[in-house]
Amino acid sequence: MKILVLLSIFIFSVINCNAENYDKKETKTLILYYSQTGVTKQVAEELQRRLGADIEEIEVTNPYNGTYEETIGRCIEERKKDELPHIRPLKSDLKKYRTIFLGYPIWFGTYARPVITLVKSFKFANREIIPFCTFGSGGLIESTNNLKKDLPLAYVKDGFGIREARISRVKEELDRFLKLNGFIAGTVEIFPEYSEQRPVNEEDKKIFSEACSSYKYPLGTPIALSCRKTNKGMDYLFISKGKTPDGKEVNSKIFVTVENNQKPEFTMVVR
């Protein structure tokens, strides 16, 4: 009888222990990001709100807290000297996370230099990496490709990007990204493919100008486009002809959206 009582107590303890472990199960997702001006931080915090994941900001020991021009100048000097910024030790143990949303602003066409420091110090082996970034014109595709190259042991997925000028749309656009990729439940409109490319006409040029003229750098001259209709309006994919800073001719893809009765906005450049 005594043996049966002890056995019952043991089984009950095991069940309680397992239940406690389940209730206290640690999250397997981390939102890890660097933000210089606070814009990328807005995306990270919205991600955390939607996913309920852990979150941590990458901090630089000598912050990039100057003007835009001063930051550019510092980065150029660091690149000349082959130097990278020092970052503070992370509080999170990266080894316990299976999925990491890695956020950054785009600098010089790719992920910001503090994230380069991180990538060189941790290989993210067998981790699923979902990039998210903010930018002036573009860089999501190039930075994602660079992460795939620089982190060959990780599973780098297609990421999320948004122009700083459109940060007010982050809730809406992030909601679509998360649902489309199965991170949260819900359905979204499946956009059709872009139409066949055709030469631009005067009306197309006007749309391009309205969308791009306020950007501080020239985006070239539109020569062709494709388009698609959505529930909210029309999306355009312009092919633009321009020149690189060293004078070489280059074609770029300029994505423009025109929501119903709204001003055209360019959403991304792919060079």
Describe the role of every protein-language-model region.
Residues 58-70:
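Short connector loops at secondary-structure junctions
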Residues 39-42, 63-66, 247:
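Short, solvent-exposed loop/turn elements at domain surfaces
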Residues 65-68, 167-172, 234:
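Short, solvent-exposed polar/charged micro-motifs at secondary-structure junctions
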Residues 9-13, 17-30, 34-45, 49-60, ...:
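FMN-binding flavodoxin-like domain, especially the glycine-rich phosphate-binding loop
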Residues 1-5:
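Positively charged n-region of N-terminal signal peptides that target proteins for export
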Residues 180-271:
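N- and C-terminal low-complexity/disordered segments
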